[in-house]
Amino acid sequence: MTGEEVKEPKEQQEITEVKEQEPEISYNAIVLNGVGGYDKVKVEVKKGVPTLKSDEILVRVQACGLNFSDLLVRQGAFGKHHSLGTECAGVVEAIGDLVIDRKVGDKIIMLNIDGGLWTELVVTTVNRTFLMPDGMSFQEAAAISVNYTAAYVMIYDFANLRPSQSILIHMAAGGVGIAATQLCKLVHDVTIFGTASPSKHETIKENGVTYPIDYTTLDYAEEVRKIAPKGVDIVLDPLGGADDSKGFGLLKPLGKLVLYGSANQVTAPKRSSLAAAKVWWHKFNIDALQLINSNKAVCGFHLGRTDPDHVAEVIRKLISLYKEGKIKPKVDSVWSFEQVGDAMRHMRNTRTLEKSSWSLKSRQLMPQLEIKSVSKRQG
């Protein structure tokens, strides 16, 4: 060969030019770099399209729910291998060849107790998704699966709420508290006691609480006894420590105490050994004979330990209730991905659970994706 320039075929030049013009796909994901304070939560830019199997779907996330459990995950309460984000809502971007009951463009609710949903693109299986009903916003959709499912199981499965009974809902202005109140109102003539700071009393009354109680300056047990000397039929307790014993003491015979959290441990951005020790020191203990003699029941609830098929059944019931106008998720505020630390700080500073439902709003500026490894179905 001489020193003459070797030219590429015209077809090869065109392919090269097209490749150079293709935008690089990237998306944001919130990750946990260790456990501890707010500095451990970071926004990372991921490059490329997530791999999709034939039985999976790719979802472009529009909103993510922030729950109290995410604060505990950040603090390391569940170990070092848990991921943030258990619920979100978005639009189906692509589907695998074997998927027949979802299509591109479907708006869906997504739940994954193992976390990992705080990302703009997520791959999941169909059984973890539920079609959004007409009229539901993405923020509402990202606020229904955890709080309302937890409240539904505790009230109807564990406590078996019946007409003319009474219930104490701690942190009634919180995500679970709002959901529990609305679900209690579906049963005839239920008396609802709800604890909240004074600034939230009007809100929880509008939501259905019969008797708001200021837990910040008053003894809530004494306040309940003033109105219901015999106590209440049900106590929903997310607090832990001494409040568990207090709640048990408030029960009528045949009453039920449902424990589902330990909010008293979250007193600072980082996990507090002192707070944990205080909760442990005041932990609720009762033996079988004492329980029999008390004529009461104690239940412990963990959404992650609930049968997935039952969870799916409950979510479908909740969607039906939403369609009927019987429940309505309340979104307190919307934050961008970059504000995740501020959102967590705000949740803790406003008495942790004392929120409605939160959303982390993802950006909507990503280019349209072209997924060639799976079939897209527009039907």
Swiss-Prot record:
* Protein keywords: Cytoplasmic vesicle, Membrane, Oxidoreductase, Phosphoprotein, Synapse
Q: Which PROSITE patterns does the record associate with it? A: QOR_ZETA_CRYSTAL
Per the UniProt entry, the Enzyme Commission number(s) are 1.-.-.-
Q: Which residues carry this modification: Phosphoserine?
A: 273
GO biological process terms, semicolon-separated: negative regulation of mitochondrial fusion
One Gene Ontology term of the molecular function aspect = oxidoreductase activity
Q: What subcellular locations does the record give?
A: Cytoplasmic vesicle, Secretory vesicle, Synaptic vesicle membrane
Say which domain of life the source belongs to: Eukaryota
Name the PANTHER family for this protein.
Answer: SYNAPTIC VESICLE MEMBRANE PROTEIN VAT-1 HOMOLOG, SYNAPTIC VESICLE MEMBRANE PROTEIN VAT-1 HOMOLOG-LIKE
What the record says about family reads:
Belongs to the zinc-containing alcohol dehydrogenase family. Quinone oxidoreductase subfamily.
Q: What does this protein do?
A: May play a central role in the functions mediated by specific classes of synaptic vesicles.
Tell me more from the record.
Answer: Synthesized in the neuronal cell bodies and transported to the terminals. Each vesicle contains approximately 28 molecules of VAT-1.
Q: What is this protein called?
A: Synaptic vesicle membrane protein VAT-1
